[in-house]
A protein has these predicted regions:
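Hydrophobic/aromatic-rich alpha-helical bundle segments in the mid-to-C-terminal region
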Residues: 115, 126-138, 149-197
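Helix-turn-helix
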Residues: 21, 25-63, 67
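Hydrophobic alpha-helical connector segments
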Residues: 67, 81-111, 160-163
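Short hydrophobic clusters on alpha-helical segments that form packing/core surfaces
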Residues: 22-30, 72, 101, 167
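N-terminal intrinsically disordered/low-complexity leader segments
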Residues: 1-17
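Amphipathic alpha-helical segments used for helix-helix packing
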Residues: 92-93, 107-128
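Short, basic, alpha-helical segments at the C-terminal edge of helix-turn-helix-like DNA-binding modules
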Residues: 70-76
Length: 197
C-alpha cells in the first residue's frame, strides 16, 4: 500500500519540528535506498538537521526504523479511516482501497511499495523488529477482511490476503520492470474481481 509520510500539519510558513523532519526523511530514504544503505548521517542531511542532533531523538538506527514503522502505521490507519468515512458500501471501500494502490504508481515503479519494501527488508534482518513490520502489513489485510466479511464472505481472510498479495506482487513487478502500468492493470482486474463478489 502506498502512503506519504510527512510531519504534522503546521501553520503556513512554519516548518515541522526536527523529529518530524527526521522521521519523514528516514521514511523516504529507507524507501528509496533501503535500510542497509541508509545512514543516520544521510537522514540528518535529508532532514536538514545537524548530524549530532539526531542522537537527541534517536540513539540507534533501529529506533529510527521503529519511528518510521509508527509513522507508516499512523498513515495507513488514517487512510483506511478516510476510506471508511467516504464510502458506505464494502465494495466501494474495497475499490477505493485499490485506487490507493495506483495513487503513487510512478514512485512504486521506481522504488517499490513503501510498506512492502520496508517489511520485506525487516524480515531479512537478524536483529529484526519484524513483529512491528508484520503488524504494519496486517493492518490493511485485517481492514480488507472486515470488508469482505461485510459482503457475507466466509472466506474473508483468504480474500483479504489475496488482495494484498495481488497488490504487493504487482508492486514488485512494476518496480522490477520499471513499468507503472502494471499497477493500473492490476487495479482494473481487482476492481472487476470485486464486482463479482
Amino acid at each position: 500500500m502506498t502512503d506519504s509520510i510527512s510531519g504534522p500539519a503546521t501553520d503556513v510558513g512554519q516548518r515541522p519540528g526536527k523529529r518530524e523532519r527526521l522521521v519523514a526523511a528516514a521514511a523516504q530514504l529507507l524507501h528509496e535506498q533501503g535500510i542497509e544503505r541508509t545512514t543516520l548521517a544521510d537522514i540528518a542531511a535529508a532532514a536538514d538537521v545537524p548530524a549530532g542532533n539526531v542522537y537527541y531523538y534517536f540513539k540507534t538506527k533501529d529506533e529510527v526504523i521503529a519511528a518510521v514503522i509508527e509513522a507508516h502505521t499512523h498513515q495507513v490507519k488514517t487512510t483506511l479511516a478516510a476510506i471508511d468515512a467516504h464510502h458506505r458500501s464494502p465494495k466501494n471501500r474495497l475499490k477505493a482501497f485499490v485506487r490507493e494502490f495506483t495513487a503513487q504508481s510512478e514512485i512504486v515503479a521506481q522504488h517499490g511499495c513503501p510498506l512492502g519494501s520496508l517489511c520485506s527488508e525487516l524480515g531479512k534482518r537478524v536483529n529484526r523488529p519484524g513483529f512491528a513490520a508484520a503488524e504494519l502489513m496486517r493492518l490493511p489485510i485485517d481492514w480488507a477482511e472486515e470488508q469482505f466479511r461485510s459482503l457475507g464472505r466466509r472466506d474473508a481472510h483468504d480474500l483479504a490476503t489475496d488482495l494484498m498479495a495481488a497488490y504487493e506482487g504487482s508492486a514488485l513487478l512494476a518496480n522490477t520492470l520499471g513499468d507503472p502500468s502494471i499497477l493500473s492493470g492490476a487495479a482494473r482486474r481487482l476492481n472487476r474481481w470485486i464486482d463479482t463478489l
